[in-house]
Swiss-Prot record:
Subunit structure: Homodimer. Component of the GSH degradosomal complex.
Entry protein name: Cys-Gly metallodipeptidase DUG1
MF-aspect GO terms: metal ion binding; metallodipeptidase activity; peptidase activity
Family that this chain belongs to: Belongs to the peptidase M20A family.
Gene (UniProt): DUG1
GO CC term (a single one): cytoplasm
Compartments it resides in: Cytoplasm
TM spans (from-to): none
Tree of life domain: Eukaryota
Organism taxonomic ancestry: Eukaryota, Fungi, Dikarya, Ascomycota, Saccharomycotina
Species assigned in the record: Candida albicans (strain SC5314 / ATCC MYA-2876)
Function comment: Catalytic component of the GSH degradosomal complex involved in the degradation of glutathione (GSH) and other peptides containing a gamma-glu-X bond. Also functions as a dipeptidase with high specificity for Cys-Gly and no activity toward tri- or tetrapeptides.
Annotated EC: 3.4.13.-
Keywords noted in UniProt: Cytoplasm, Dipeptidase, Hydrolase, Manganese, Metal-binding, Metalloprotease, Phosphoprotein, Protease, Zinc
Active site per the UniProt annotation: 111, 178 (proton acceptor)
PROSITE patterns (alphabetical): ARGE_DAPE_CPG2_2
Amino acid sequence: MSTSTTYEKLPLQPLFDTIEELKPKFIERLQKAIAIPSVSSDESLRPKVVEMANFLVDELKTLGFTDIQLKELGTQPPPVQDANLQLPPIVLGRFGNDPAKKTVLVYGHYDVQPALKDDGWKTEPFTMHYDKEKEILYGRGSTDDKGPVVGWLNVIEAHNKLGWELPVNLVVCFEGMEESGSLGLDELVAKEAQNYFKKVDQVTISDNYWLGTTKPVLTYGLRGCNYYQIIIEGPGADLHSGIFGGIIAEPMTDLIKVMSTLVDGSGKILIPGVYDMVAPLTDKEDQLYDSIDFSVEELNAASGSQTSLHDNKKDILKHRWRFPSLSLHGIEGAFSGAGAKTVIPAKVVGKFSIRTVPDIESKKLDDLVFQHITSEFKKLNSPNKFKVELIHDGNYWVSDPFNDSFTAAAKATQDVWNVVPDFTREGGSIPITLTFEKELGVDVLLLPMGRGDDGAHSINEKLDVSNYINGCKTLGGYLHYYGKA
């Protein structure tokens, strides 16, 4: 496939040059953001999460945003150690309010995953390390998601310095609980849909990554996730296998038998009716996979093994993105420590999830899962008690990769990177994507900044300087092309 497509380029070089000129200041801004350990899962660090929100408010004020609000979400629900623990606020702000312009809402999160140097970091996780030889910025939150969040601020600063008018109205929505379940966000979006977000025409999220390390992508789909547990309970207490082994029905044996009927060794889901709900692959979609820059070797490198179930790129990507999968996650209540323990567990809970795709209906999937597991347990004729439950579910999301948003983002990407981006889907879930689409009734674009090897949630999280600075150019260029669409 050609590395370029023909389109009318906008005169954006002055903007790109200004972003390059401001590079030292932009790196300093990210350094300040990383220095605030805004770990949402650590109650003792909640003041730091709030400090990060206030940092963003100060930045927005300096840049000329208006109608800046800190939306308080109330007390955090259990389980918590502090019953009065307050949820971090959601930061809202506007830049421009011209009724003749389109309005773009950008979402990001300012909280991060926990990180300690003792975890294996080469440097202090909350002190940004700038490796000038490799041109890499290391630090917790560098790519997930403080880099993209301050990237939007950088775009505004570059326009201000140039004296350029922003081609759209911009609304920002930055939350502080994304890494801990986005508590309160869905309710706020629903509440503000006809208030603060009333005139929004489009939502852009930069909270995902390139598929690999060399080619930018635009993401138009995410799988959903239905998470289940199977509870099997027998004896009144854990028992000694030397005394009771062979003479009672063991819950663990029942559970293993039932869980073995869910998926086979090739990854095929064995629950009847699941694949009947999957939307057929169209020729147009199938062609999108041809040009995507990916290989079996990259999968092996990412997994640290040679255990792929598929031997070619297209099959790997289809099974990661557009076919459902079932994964067994663990067994609660069973012995899992080192050494040998001859206990018969009295109660075990098996955990598994199904990644969902179009056109799987969540409720119908639940019914199929419950029917299958109930049927398989009945075949055992076991005297043990049995129950299957849905723990949580989140729907899949798929957009039109040929709409105005994606077309504008593709042009901006080509301007900056001189290559047509890959159009990708992802195997994971970003639930807020669906919430914005449903509540606001507008298109959502996933426009990633970081690479596939950035190590979000891992040790030595990083963001390449080229991705950070070119990412800012891409975000800015996108606003111009979308404003003209």
